[in-house]
């Protein structure tokens, strides 16, 4: 792996005029991004923040439920979101929000400033009001639309602000970008268990269970579904698992899970390859071969996962057609491998273009995005596909998109 480089200097030891302009432009973008996040956060906090759960939920209203035994990555409070529906069906949704796999990534949580400037930013480390818009009232979590086939379901959104795929159990000391000693609380597993206690208290006997997740939450689905069904909902027999975008190959996942996240042995011991998602899925199905319906979704040239892939391989937080092509080829292989361990798994493959053309690639996740309702070439939306699958009608969508020999986007 290459080492990270600093911006080049001119022969005189100072930045060139062009570099100075670039630095100033980045600073302006950073300030603008921070300002936009603050404005949106204040708006949510003052006018649109989900009410605190008071013990008497109104149907189809999202509530925040703080959990006293849980903690976000920066040590601040942790809450989940709950919604009561009109049925006995329950969706447990694992939120995404990046990953920290070493000291460098731990020191660079997501901020509006970093995103706007294109600076490395790897994971959300708290649940500030701004994060609400990523968690509820979009895609599968919409409540005010008849087009959502899950609108009548009960929901528990297990939020995520720990950078550990929901399985960490340790505290990690790192040096921040400004030189301060900080602690990243990898408490994802404890947050998960506290969330499940609340879920069982509110929704004790679901007739149907959908365990779903996007991005980092998609990795948690195979890691934690066995615990959910063994310990918390052992009597539910109608269970569907769905992961949206869980592909990031890295040769040191076992070391990260064991030594950085301090995850329990049950999570790091099955990790033998560079594909943590595949290893966790193989472990889950080897011990519970006929327990679940299994679903997976991805876009073909995911701009964000390819950025992370490039960072893992080359220590460059960027994406381009070459790394997107590599991501595509890895996706082709992963789909083959998933089908080999779960012949009945159904796939939803799409190629919706990323909304920032300069970066290229395809979008990252769809289940909690407007793309959830967008029709594919086969005239079916993810919403329809997922609803059918939860009722036992499994089908593949978009598999022809994986038949290219040379990938480009």
Regions inferred by a protein language model and the residue ranges of each:
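C-terminal His-loop and adjacent cap/lid subdomain of alpha/beta-hydrolase
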Residues: 2-409
């Amino acid at each position: 792996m290459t080492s990270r480089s600093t911006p080049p200097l001119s022969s005189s030891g100072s930045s060139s005029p062009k570099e100075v302009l670039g630095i100033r432009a980045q600073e302006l973008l950073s300030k603008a991004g921070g300002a936009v996040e603050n404005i949106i956060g204040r708006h949510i906090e003052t006018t649109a923040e989900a009410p605190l759960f008071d013990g008497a939920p109104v149907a189809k209203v999202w509530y925040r439920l703080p959990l006293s035994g849980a903690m976000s990555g920066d040590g601040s409070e942790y809450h989940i979101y709950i919604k009561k529906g009109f049925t006995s069906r329950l969706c447990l949704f694992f939120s995404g929000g990046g990953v920290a796999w070493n000291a460098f990534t731990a020191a660079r949580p997501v901020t509006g400033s970093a995103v706007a400037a294109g600076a490395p930013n790897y994971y959300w480390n708290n649940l500030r009001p701004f994060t609400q818009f990523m968690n509820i009232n979009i895609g599968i979590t919409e409540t005010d639309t008849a087009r959502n086939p899950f609108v009548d379901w009960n929901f528990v959104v297990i939020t995520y602000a720990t950078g550990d795929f929901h399985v960490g159990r340790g505290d990690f000391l790192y040096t921040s970008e400004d030189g301060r000693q900080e602690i990243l609380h990898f408490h994802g597993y404890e947050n998960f268990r506290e969330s499940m206690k609340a879920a069982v208290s509110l929704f004790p006997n679901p007739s149907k269970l959908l365990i779903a997740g996007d991005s980092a939450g998609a990795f948690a689905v195979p890691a934690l579904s066995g615990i959910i069904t063994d310990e918390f909902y052992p009597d539910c027999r109608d269970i569907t698992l769905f992961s949206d975008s869980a592909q990031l190959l890295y040769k040191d996942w076992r070391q990260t899970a064991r030594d950085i996240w301090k995850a329990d042995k049950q999570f790091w011991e099955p990790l033998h390859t560079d594909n943590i998602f595949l290893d966790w899925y193989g472990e889950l199905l080897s011990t519970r071969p006929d327990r679940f319906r299994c679903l997976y979704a991805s876009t073909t040239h995911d701009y964000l996962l390819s950025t992370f892939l490039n960072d893992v391989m080359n220590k460059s937080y960027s994406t381009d057609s070459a790394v997107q092509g590599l991501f595509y080829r890895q996706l082709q292989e992963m789909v083959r491998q998933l089908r080999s361990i779960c012949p009945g798994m159904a796939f939803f493959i799409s190629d919706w273009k990323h909304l920032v053309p300069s970066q290229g690639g395809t979008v990252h996740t769809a289940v909690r995005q407007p793309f959830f309702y967008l029709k594919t070439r086969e005239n079916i939306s993810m919403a329809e596909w997922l609803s059918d699958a939860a009722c036992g009608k499994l089908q593949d969508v978009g598999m022809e998109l994986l038949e290219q020999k040379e990938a480009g986007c």
